[in-house]
């Protein structure tokens, strides 16, 4: 009897322990994929008000999803080749001061975001920034460097249609011409670039020695992947049918680098799909449609930027596009709105996660500095755009 009792107690203990481990993993996954969880909940809640029907099929912009997938997949393949590290290190090793190296890293992130999307640029170049600073004993500058790299990725990637996910979506949704897109984004891009470069002057001119790092690149694959990247860009610019481009890129990577297909940010794609459902349902609710249409009539840039502070810029772009035809105003608003709160851009969460990974006890100090710089950028950019738009 005692044996059976002990066995029952042990069994209950193991079950309780297993449940605890499972719930811990669920909580950890939810924290790591917070935006996906929120978007799925939002889609489910709105589905109670607008039950699923055939109209749901019209919510999803398959071209945007295909283009985003292709860009992420090809960039993943290029990262697997370490080509970005090789190019970045070559630039970094030409500078000899803290200011020079940190400015180079910020500029690399800036140009990287124009070609690779903002989140991919940060995933690629933040670790390089930590490597350089930690290997030269300059870890104290990590927070400021990461914040300026984050600003560069969020605010300078706005100049290209594929510089961030919301641009890719709006460029496709409104069927914008490249010329219209470029001229709409040029003023905030120039101002953002100037502000970021001015902030880089804060870094000291202290001399340092950056250790050499051996990085080998397969030149043959680099050429092939470069061609695939050009194909992905051509898809975004509507020079190539997206079905054809998707087929070629998937088949090429299937044979050359399946790992790149596995490392695609499927959570981001799922987030897009969920927010397509959420925004589509909201657009079919008459009261919501009237509310957003009325708000946006008072200033698309301001309202969209403020919306980003609460639900992030990608969801804001998808949601608000249903209620306004002011494509340029919405473009500027959701890009400028990437500054401000930590949740204003998905890329900012990547930066915070990377920083706390290297400096586990520095989260509060980082958030304080991040908020000060980011809100300053947001205020200046909104004031400038308000002045330019009369």
Question: Whereabouts are the PLM-identified features?
Answer:
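Flexible interhelical linker loops that connect adjacent transmembrane helices
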Residues: 23, 89, 202-226, 258-262
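Structural signal for alpha-helical transmembrane segments and their membrane-water exit/capping regions
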Residues: 25-55, 65-82, 201-205, 231-259, ...
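Interfacial loop-to-helix junctions that mark the boundaries of transmembrane helices
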Residues: 26-31, 54-64, 176-187, 214-218, ...
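Transmembrane helical segments that form the transport core of multi-pass membrane transport proteins
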Residues: 59, 81, 85-88, 228-325
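Membrane-interfacial loop-to-helix junctions in multi-pass transporters
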Residues: 61-64, 93-106, 135-146, 219-223, ...
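Hydrophobic transmembrane alpha-helices that form the pore/transport pathway of multi-pass ion
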Residues: 105-107, 111-155, 318-332, 360-364, ...
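Membrane-core helix-loop-helix motifs of multi-pass transport proteins
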Residues: 137-205, 210-214, 351-382
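C-terminal transmembrane helix pair
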Residues: 182-193, 302-390
């Amino acid at each position: 009897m005692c044996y059976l009792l002990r066995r029952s107690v042990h069994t209950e203990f193991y079950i309780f322990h297993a449940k605890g481990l499972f719930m811990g993993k669920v909580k950890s996954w939810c924290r790591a994929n917070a935006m996906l969880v929120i978007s799925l909940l939002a889609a489910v809640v709105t589905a109670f008000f607008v039950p699923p029907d055939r109209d749901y099929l019209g919510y999803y912009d398959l071209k945007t999803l295909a283009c985003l997938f292709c860009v992420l997949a090809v960039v993943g393949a290029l990262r697997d080749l370490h080509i970005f590290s090789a190019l970045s290190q070559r630039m970094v090793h030409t500078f000899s001061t803290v200011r020079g190296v940190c400015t180079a890293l910020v500029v690399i992130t800036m140009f990287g975001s124009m070609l690779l999307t903002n989140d991919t640029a940060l995933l690629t170049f933040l670790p390089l920034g930590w490597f350089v600073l930690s290997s030269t004993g300059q870890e104290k500058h990590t927070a400021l460097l990461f914040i300026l790299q984050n600003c560069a990725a969020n605010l300078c990637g706005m100049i290209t249609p594929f510089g961030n996910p919301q641009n890719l979506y709006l460029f496709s949704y409104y069927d914008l011409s490249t010329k219209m897109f470029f001229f709409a984004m040029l003023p905030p891009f120039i101002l953002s670039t100037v502000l970021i470069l001015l902030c880089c002057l804060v870094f000291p001119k202290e001399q340092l020695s950056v250790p050499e790092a051996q990085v080998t690149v397969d030149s043959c694959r680099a050429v092939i992947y470069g061609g695939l990247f050009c194909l992905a860009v051509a898809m975004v610019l509507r020079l190539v049918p997206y079905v054809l481009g998707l087929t070629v890129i998937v088949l090429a990577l299937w044979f050359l680098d399946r790992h790149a297909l596995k490392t695609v940010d499927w959570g981001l794609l799922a987030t897009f799909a969920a927010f397509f459902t959420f925004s589509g349902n909201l657009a079919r609710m008459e009261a919501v449609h009237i509310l957003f249409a009325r708000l946006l009539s008072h200033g698309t840039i301001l309202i969209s930027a403020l919306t980003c502070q609460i639900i992030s810029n990608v969801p804001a772009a998808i949601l608000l596009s249903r209620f306004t035809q002011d494509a340029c105003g919405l473009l500027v608003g959701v890009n400028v709105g990437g500054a401000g709160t930590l949740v204003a851009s998905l890329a900012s969460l990547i930066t915070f996660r990377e920083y706390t990974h290297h400096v586990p006890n520095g989260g509060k100090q980082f958030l304080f500095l991040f908020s000060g710089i980011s809100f300053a950028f947001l205020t200046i950019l909104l004031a400038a755009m308000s002045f330019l738009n009369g």
